[in-house]
Amino acid sequence: FVELAYTFLEDELYYRIDNKPMLVLWNAHQLYSKDSKKLYDNIRQRVKEATGLDLYLVARQPNWSPAARFHNFFMTGGVDAVYMDNMFNQMDWARSYMYPQYINENYKYNRQYTLTNYNIDFIPAISTSYNAWMWNGTDRYNVPIQMHDEGLFHDMCNVAKINLGQHPMVIIDAFN
């Protein structure tokens, strides 16, 4: 990990927040520790010793989940920000009819909760579209397809703007 940090984080083109390189912890909810604060402090310390740089740590939270669920993981661990995984990847057809409204309410709750209870910033993430069937059309049949739609993307951009955290940033999740 430290070698990777040394290789990438010192690059002047690497994304930074408050002059700190941003590091996204992809499955932070599965990073188990008896003392999450100590774990994250050790990550920061080891990278600082190797590179001389302070980190801006971002934890990726699973979609459609409440922030309080991760109290013993990254919330008390001291990450700087949280963002939620692709909100289109879910198995509820009812939600798909009003994605912008439902996602806005989810983001609003999580943004306020993380800031009020943990002083952790929130980064909204939006997606341009989503098609789970591209992997296998037989076992993902119950996941709604979200086709490329300029109007929906515009609405999702507005949802992101409404829910910006202390650092105005949006992650565009367009993996498929």
Residues of each region from the PLM?
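Glycan-processing catalytic domains of CAZymes
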Residues: 1-176
